[in-house]
């Protein structure tokens, strides 16, 4: 998709604050600092539209980005950040669960993992949870520019094995915000699901 018009329309913490115009939504989930904002910025061809931060846990609300008046990207708070209080983690969990299990406009979830590492327990739990609710999933292995292309097959195998990857309802893509590798493939998946 050629993107010229993007607007962050709202930050929400509950269903009463979600957009009401019925546009399809694609949610982005992953650990803190896995690259959700960088993926968003690359997809919409903007450098700093979605705020990136070296400080994990920056996103604390569901951020809705209207893309070309056709769909919303929904940036979900990162999980697994130790310095967030237990109460805050629980509140994030409730907010995310409410959104993912009840939002009819949600067409799919892009679940980000770090290409350099085996998925964390949180990554695995998120994948299993999305799979349980029959939500289409694109697993995006970010920071792929940090590993050689010759190691892609091994990295993909490690990630898929750890997640218990199901080829029936899930897809997989390497991605780099530095080189833009995988950008077109991610857009193709999004367009198939909206």
From Swiss-Prot:
Cross-referenced InterPro entries: G_ENGB_dom, GTP-bd, GTP-bd_ribosome_bio_YsxC, P-loop_NTPase, Small_GTP-bd
Cofactor(s) for this UniProt protein: Mg(2+)
Superkingdom of origin: Bacteria
Membrane-crossing residue ranges in chain numbering: none
Gene3D superfamilies attached to this UniProt entry: P-loop containing nucleotide triphosphate hydrolases
CDD domains: YihA_EngB (cd01876)
A Pfam family matched in the record: MMR_HSR1
Listed SUPFAM superfamilies: P-loop containing nucleoside triphosphate hydrolases (SSF52540)
Gene Ontology biological process terms, A to Z: division septum assembly
Domain EngB-type G: 22-194
GO cellular component, as recorded: cytosol
Residues holding GTP: 30-37, 57-61, 75-78, 142-145, 175-177
Molecular function terms, GO-annotated: GTP binding; metal ion binding
PROSITE patterns: G_ENGB
Keywords: Cell cycle, Cell division, GTP-binding, Magnesium, Metal-binding, Nucleotide-binding, Septation
Binding residues for Mg(2+): 37, 59
Cross-referenced PANTHER family: ENGB-TYPE G DOMAIN-CONTAINING PROTEIN, MSS1/TRME-RELATED GTP-BINDING PROTEIN
HAMAP family per the UniProt record, alphabetical: GTPase_EngB
Function summary: Necessary for normal cell division and for the maintenance of normal septation.
Stated family: Belongs to the TRAFAC class TrmE-Era-EngA-EngB-Septin-like GTPase superfamily. EngB GTPase family.
Official protein name in the record: Probable GTP-binding protein EngB
Organism of provenance: Leuconostoc mesenteroides subsp. mesenteroides (strain ATCC 8293 / DSM 20343 / BCRC 11652 / CCM 1803 / JCM 6124 / NCDO 523 / NBRC 100496 / NCIMB 8023 / NCTC 12954 / NRRL B-1118 / 37Y)
């Amino acid at each position: 998709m050629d993107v010229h018009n993007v607007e962050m329309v709202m930050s929400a913490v509950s269903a009463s604050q979600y957009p009401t115009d019925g546009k399809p939504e694609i949610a982005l989930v992953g650990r803190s600092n896995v690259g959700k904002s960088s993926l968003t910025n690359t997809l919409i061809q903007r450098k700093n539209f979605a705020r990136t931060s070296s400080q994990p846990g920056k996103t604390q609300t569901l951020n809705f980005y209207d893309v070309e008046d056709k769909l919303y990207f929904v940036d979900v708070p990162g999980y697994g950040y130790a310095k967030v209080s237990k109460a805050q983690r629980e509140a994030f969990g409730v907010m995310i669960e409410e959104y993912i299990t009840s939002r009819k406009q949600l067409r799919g979830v892009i679940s980000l993992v770090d290409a350099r590492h085996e998925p964390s327990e949180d990554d695995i739990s998120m994948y299993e949870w999305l799979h349980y609710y029959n939500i289409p999933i694109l697993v995006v292995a970010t920071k792929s520019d940090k590993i050689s292309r010759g190691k892609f097959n091994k990295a993909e195998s490690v990630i898929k094995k750890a997640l218990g990857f199901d080829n029936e309802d899930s897809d997989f893509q390497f991605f780099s915000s530095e080189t833009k590798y995988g950008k077109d493939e991610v857009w193709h998946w999004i367009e198939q699901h909206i």
